[in-house]
Amino acid sequence: LYNDIILNMNSKYLEKEKVVLKPENIPEAYNIKDLPTIMKDLNDLVGLEKIKEQVNDLVALLKFNKKTNIDIKDFNFHMCFVGNPGTGKTTVARIITEILYNLGYIKQNKLTEVTAKDLIAGYVGQTSPKTFNVVNSALGGVLFIDEAYSITTGANRVAEFGSECIATLLKLMEDYRDKLIVIFAGYNEEMKRFLDSNPGLTSRIGYTREFKDYSIEELLQIFLNLVHRNNMDITNEALEKVKNIIEKSSKSSNFGNGRYIRNIFQKILIEHSKNIEKYNLDENIFFTDDILLIDKDDINYEKLIFEGKDSKKIGF
């Protein structure tokens, strides 16, 4: 830890400059939360009630193991997260990583996020070493493979490389069972086909978690959380406009769920900043709460609506 702190500080300051050790000098991997704080982060997430229940089940098992030292080395803790983009898969993966580290199941508070292109090479014989290097870099923590189904999709040669990647992963998941957790993530149907075509993977995955799309009310709550987290507020009229935009946008086939909400909040903030700039020409004007109040004029319907590729039929 000492060496990591010094390296972190040396990268920011001149060699002879006298500096004071500050919290930001501590590498992220060492900024460890206690378990109650981690569980609060989990429970504060909007929706995901079934996921929270399943994570709590895992916590109960790991806490029992810590108290009794039962033998769980042969348990399968590799996971599969299925659901549309923006439904919280990566966020929950980060929280699970913190939990596993806090309870001593993994050695490092480290989540390594990759996709198929990080695992598969373009030439014969190079995929296995490339996959091995990625797994090796993730040892001691959690390896999160997003859009994992794309490992085995594509033209014949690509599929061949994908099979090599899967074979390597299977061996390493077994060999390093006590040093690595792998989480495969992706769309529901694509992940089902991916697992069905690889029986070896299915047998090594101990948990499958389904992340459902957020309801309109949950999406609106995520938006409000972003507003309040930034010490801002929003008028009822503006909030109603946001709700209407979310309702229409959510009918698109490739709607981004929570990710879309973060994007529209950013766009609304930009519009709000422009409007404040227009009416606040005097830089010395007295600061008022109105500056942090989002109103209907900040909600630009054309910029915020998401049409997507097509629209879902209501009620089907």
Feature-to-residue mapping (PLM):
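C-terminal engagement/docking regions of AAA+ P-loop ATPases
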Residues: K33, S273-F316
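Canonical AAA+ ATPase core
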Residues: Y149-N156, I166-K212, R229-N230
